[in-house]
Amino acid sequence: MKRFDELYEELLKATIDNREEEYIENLDAFDAHQLDCLLNPKKHPLVWSTKSCECPKDDRHCVKVCPFHAIFPDESGQLQVDEAACAGCSYCIQECRAKRLTASKDAISVLRALRSHKGLSYALIAPAFLGQFKDVTPGKLRTAFTKIGFDGMLEVALFADILT
């Protein structure tokens, strides 16, 4: 059976390469719930369980650290996330010793939306990316965005200049 991270990486690459349907048709030995989480992230909580929890019932750090009491064991002892209560703070993910929790992944649904959208789509970025990604120039970033389906890129600072 494919691990969650393998399924995500392969599906993301297939989506980028416009081979998503072919990939899914040929997929075997996978967790259907994990695939549904990746294809339809809005139908699932902000935090996903990628495997069954095997922590002792009285020593689940993820449950203890959640300030919103959004993660809890169900009747069978498996972890559930209350979608309404979860704020996506990721404390539970950081505290999961077995690394069986992950944050919602929406890159695939964004790529699908870009491809099906009629009209122009621009990536709006903060100028802080220059300090965060030293080797990435605005030109490289713009090229990357256009390769995945955006029509262009605008820095949000441009709008601040226009409005002031």
Which sequence ranges carry the predicted segments?
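Charged, low-complexity surface patches
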Residues: 55, 85, 133-137
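Iron-sulfur-associated redox domains of electron-transfer enzymes in respiratory
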Residues: 1-15, 20-22, 104-164
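N-terminal juxtadomain amphipathic helix
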Residues: 44, 48, 52, 82-84, ...
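Ferredoxin-type iron-sulfur electron-transfer modules and their immediate structural context
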Residues: 1-65, 69
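Iron-sulfur cluster-binding cysteine motifs and their immediate structural context
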Residues: 57-82, 87, 91-107
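Fold-independent oxyanion-binding glycine-rich loops
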Residues: 23-26, 69, 83-84, 99, ...
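Short, glycine-/Ser/Thr-/acidic-enriched flexible segments
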Residues: 28-31, 42-45, 87, 128-130, ...
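Gly-rich Lys/Arg/Thr-decorated short loops/hinges at beta-loop-alpha junctions or inter-strand turns
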Residues: 41-47, 90-93, 122-125
